[in-house]
């Protein structure tokens, strides 16, 4: 399969599109055909090597942290998902791998996509949405009913807010 792979840290020249082996699901993994992937500041910080002291991946490494797609396989212990389900997910930091034709992710990091949300819109929700939730709820203590301003409302955070307000 094709994937965007980090060969060495630095600028864009350190990463390239190349053929790699398809991932193999672990018992709790979902195997997904990636239809769209989100691009975030963490992705280029990772490529630049700014996170290597924390994550320490073995290079070469498939980049990408969030995606949307269709389930094409499940591990033996998966209970909540089936082949054909439309899902979006945030890949665990130590695994990454969203910038590929297929990705594996633990079922705890996957959610079913709303039927009226397309893959492109859904791919931008997991990382930005979870980051916003953690910031608002855990760091700032925002409570239900309080108002907040969402700057850049067309991204993952705005999409989540729009979805929550529209039912």
Indicate where each model-derived feature is located.
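Conserved S-adenosyl-L-methionine
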Residues: 164-167
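NAD(P)H dinucleotide-binding glycine-rich loop of Rossmann-like/cofactor-binding domains
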Residues: 56, 80, 90-152
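Cytochrome P450 core scaffold surrounding the K-helix E-X-X-R motif
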Residues: 42-48
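Short, conserved catalytic or interaction motifs in soluble domains
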Residues: 8, 44, 76, 115, ...
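Glycine-rich beta-strand-centered segment in the early N-terminal region that forms part
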Residues: 21-39, 51-94
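N-terminal Rossmann NAD(P)H-binding glycine-rich loop of SDR-like oxidoreductase domains
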Residues: 154, 162
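Residues forming the Rossmann-fold NAD(P)(H) cofactor-binding site
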Residues: 159
């Amino acid at each position: 399969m094709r994937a965007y792979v980090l060969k060495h840290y630095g600028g864009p020249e350190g990463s390239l599109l190349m053929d790699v082996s398809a991932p193999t699901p672990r018992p709790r993994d979902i195997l997904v055909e990636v239809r769209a992937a989100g691009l975030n500041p963490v992705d280029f910080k990772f490529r630049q090597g700014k996170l290597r002291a924390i994550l320490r991946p073995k290079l070469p490494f498939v980049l990408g942290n969030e995606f949307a797609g269709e389930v094409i396989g499940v591990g033996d212990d998966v209970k909540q998902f089936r082949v054909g389900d439309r899902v979006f997910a945030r890949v665990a930091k130590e695994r990454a791998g969203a910038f590929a034709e297929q990705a594996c992710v633990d079922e705890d990091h996957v959610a079913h996509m709303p039927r009226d949300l397309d893959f492109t819109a859904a791919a931008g929700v997991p990382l930005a949405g979870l980051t916003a939730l953690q910031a608002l709820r855990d760091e700032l203590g925002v409570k239900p009913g309080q108002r907040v301003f969402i700057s850049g409302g067309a991204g993952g955070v705005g999409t989540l807010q729009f979805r929550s307000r529209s039912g």
